[in-house]
Amino acid sequence: ILNVGKTGFAWLTSAEAIGSVVAGLVVSQFPKLRKQGLMFFVSVFVFGLATILLGLSKTFGLAMIALFLVGAGDAVSTVIRNTIRQLQTPDHIRGRMTSVNQIFFMGGPQLGEVEAGLVAAAFGVPFSIVSGGIGCIVGLILVVWKWPQLVHYDGHETLPAPATAD
């Protein structure tokens, strides 16, 4: 990959984890995060944009930066998502909610990898990576459009329950 040899490949495979650890350490320094909704959406946007950057990168340095940002964006969004889920879920269903989250957390990425592999086989690896980043940002825009109040979530307010079909 990028003709960087074994050592370069090792650094590339570590860059995302390094970004996650650094972001996790930074976030842990704030006992009470403000503007959680905005921070969540910014971190998901960074994740998507960095994924696009990775797909377009032709140099080792740019790929390292992109992967570092992918890891950082993912770590921050995961921390905030888990915090919101814990604070907003009623006590009597928190265990079930956590179980559902774990199913998606453990199974979702593997399904995404199958999709990415199929797209890469049909259109090439760079297209697969770039289209994944674009899909992330498009999904983010759709969520903001459908639930704009989430952007303003600050940890104090109760989020409205989703509408049910009658």
Name what the model sees in each region:
Residues I1-D166:
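C-terminal transmembrane bundle of multi-pass solute transporters/carriers
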